[in-house]
Amino acid sequence: VALTILGLSGALSHDPSAALYIDGKLVAAAEEERFVRDKHAKNRMPYESAKFCLEQAGIKPSDVDVVAIPFAPISLFGKARWHYAKRYWYAPDRALDAILMGNRRYKRYRNKIVFCLEQLGFDPKKIKIEPVEHHLAHASSAYHCSGFKEKTAILGIDGKGEYATTFFGYGENGKITKLKEFFDPDSLGGLYGAITEFLGFEMLDGEFKVMGMAPYGDASKYDFSRLASFENGELVINTEYANVIGLRRYKENGKGFYFSPKLIEWLGPKREGDIADEPYIHYAASMQALFEKLSLQMIDYYLGDILKETGKLAFAGGCALNVKLNQKIIARPDVKELFVQPASGDAGTAVGAAAYVSHARGVPVEKMEHVYLGPAYSNEDVIAACARHPGNPAWRKINNTPENIAKIMVDGNPVAWFQGRMEFGPRALGGRSIIGCPSSSGVADRINEQIKFRERWRPFCPSMLDTVAPQMIKVDHPAPFMTFTFEVAEEWKTRVPEVVHEDGTSRAQVLKREYNPRYYDMMKALEVLTGNGVSLNTSLNRRGEPMVCSPTDALNMFFGSDLQYLIMEDILVVKEGAPTYESLD
């Protein structure tokens, strides 16, 4: 009998998702936001995503052996709740809560999950729910999905789970051993989030913007060392300035922030607007530099010995999406290979919790080779969506789709590209992407004008053929998920200028054909036409919206933007007034 495990996340009131393992194979995984069309799907449960997973596998709720959740009760006999109470002494109500009712959030979440499962048709008397500690779920999503056979160092850095904020451990023969955890408020992810808010962005999305702004600034102009220190193996955040609650918060128009008025006294008013200017670019640079410095020190201290032994590191948690840190980690002489869980944020804990329980029940899970784990749609589905759509799309079926789309791109046109199964995790990787020819001058600006409206200092990223990577980024380190940045070779900076960031790096996806043949063939066609087997690749969505899931989502986005071309499977939709490329047929 197959072991069927449904993993559900959403414990921290954002990024609910569902993942389904059957006999160690990840058959489906998706984020709730894509179905409900609400970014991060805050305060929701993974109802639609779980429904999709069951449908994709063709199973009923009664076929599920166990439901794994990435949030667990924390004992009063450990350090976590006492640490929280001691560090938050200035908010006695919250401190006492941690001691007296420290698992209230767990109980509330579990009840919501049970309700969600009942809505899906699970029998409440028969549901087996297995809680996995939040940071163990992150750790499992990194280690168990890495495919590493030897002893593996495991790192988890995020905002916070139940109480833990940082996890150090190792994996050996499928078993995870915890070496050390830090607890709220001592959170590097929390500090980065607080500075993100101060720089005028929102936590959860803004961190990427801070990281993108950092290369424009000079980290030596402002010393941020007072904000956090790592000494004698302990990370301490200065809660005079950041990671604050209650009365210590800076407030503006009734909204409380994660930093204190003291930070404003020191650095001046919080940033407003869309411009990357002084002193804020320097603050971004200083925050990124402090984050890298402390992370690398902590890795040294807790994981250095294991890395010297085998050189394998598995990394997850929201901060694992900091691609600049990852570049520094790969550059360490003691790191042979770094695996970053592509859905490192809380969405990935659905995979992690399920993988953890699968291992605990004696069924190892397979290596995560790709993230095409969401819904797919046929040409017939696409045509039906076009027929129903009020925008009355002009569509036609084309042949040799990859080659023909490359021809449209070479003329400088961005194309909305909708092929195969939707990606799991925050990165578009050639399933739901907007693509452009990176040697075509101004294509990034056109994407911004037509749809993205991004701040100009935010980079666009390349996907490339595995045959191109050795020349362009000069590494043989695997990079299938856009979780690392690499130095771009000088010659390639001029060949594909549209995908190189201010600091000469690119966040690259290096693609092997077997995982996405169509996307690969499109880049092969670009290589034939331009000499470069590289595509500009950004996610298929409008600013502030989740990535597109269905053909109807794609059409809504297409007609709500100035994009001219949309290809869904073999169905090409062209905006009125745009060249139709009739010759392609």
Name every feature range the model reports, one short phrase each.
Residues 5-77:
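N-terminal cofactor/phosphate-binding cores enriched in small/glycine residues
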Residues 285-311:
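Phosphate/ATP-binding catalytic cores across multiple sugar-kinase/actin-like superfamilies
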Residues 99-107, 129-132, 273, 277-293, ...:
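Short acidic-aromatic active-site loops that bind/stabilize oxyanions
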Residues 10-31, 36-39, 83, 90-94, ...:
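Flexible beta->alpha loop and helix N-cap segments adjacent to enzyme active/binding sites
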Residues 195, 295, 318:
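Conserved hydrophobic/aromatic pocket- or pore-lining residues that grip, position, or stack substrates
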